[in-house]
């Protein structure tokens, strides 16, 4: 699970998501603001590692070691586009499946059974789930024992980055905590509420948990 300011806000409002996060095998800090806050609290986190940083590295290692990958999520055709791009970039990569579930799939038992069987049929070493928070976290938590995949990773918009559908912020912007602004300039309508309404709540949470 990768924790950004947005995810912190969601965890504060969703006890179930908090429980899922607490039980995750790996939790990453995805966002410079959280690094700064950790230093302010004198409990510094060593580094920012976002899902979009981690997943390409995992794909490189998978190609090197011969591990298999399944990509699920994104709009129709995006996961397949990411597959084709990765196959051009990484010699030897084995992407054994992609799927873009329909809207509301997480509430459809037949669709969930279909997805779990689809994954189990190819038993990937790495499952990359890209539905956004909290859908991806809840789906993996509720289904990882029902499908056959060795490792499952929550990756959010990473499928769009892998496909080249959305460009990542330049390194200097990420290093200075401005990746959010770059994302906003790319998708202002979709991102306005997140960055200028929801995420502002982090200020009150900083005060609430100041001790």
Model-identified regions with their sequence ranges:
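N-terminal nucleotide/polyanion-binding subdomain common to many enzyme families
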Residues: 1-53
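Short glycine-rich anion-binding loops that position phosphate/pyrophosphate groups of nucleotides
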Residues: 4-8, 131-136, 158-159
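Conserved beta-alpha
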Residues: 41-118, 122
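Conserved acidic residues
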Residues: 25, 96, 125, 150
């Amino acid at each position: 699970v990768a924790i950004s300011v947005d995810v912190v806000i969601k965890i504060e409002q969703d006890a179930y998501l908090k429980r899922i996060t607490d039980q995750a095998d790996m939790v990453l800090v995805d966002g410079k603001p959280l690094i700064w806050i950790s230093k302010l609290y004198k409990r510094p986190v060593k580094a920012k590692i976002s899902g979009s940083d981690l997943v390409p590295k995992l794909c490189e290692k998978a190609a090197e070691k011969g591990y298999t990958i399944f990509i699920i999520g994104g709009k129709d055709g995006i996961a397949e586009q990411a597959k084709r791009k990765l196959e051009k970039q990484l010699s030897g990569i084995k992407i054994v499946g992609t799927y873009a579930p329909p809207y509301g799939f997480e509430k459809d038992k037949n669709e969930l059974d279909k997805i779990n069987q689809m994954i189990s049929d190819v038993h990937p070493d790495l499952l990359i789930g890209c539905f956004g928070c909290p859908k991806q976290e809840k789906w993996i938590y509720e289904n990882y024992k029902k499908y056959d995949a060795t490792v499952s990773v929550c990756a959010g918009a990473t499928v769009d980055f892998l496909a080249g559908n959305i460009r990542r912020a330049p390194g200097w912007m990420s290093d200075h905590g401005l990746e959010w602004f770059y994302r906003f300039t790319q998708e202002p309508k979709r991102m306005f509420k997140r960055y200028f309404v929801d995420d502002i709540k982090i200020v009150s949470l900083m005060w609430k948990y100041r001790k």
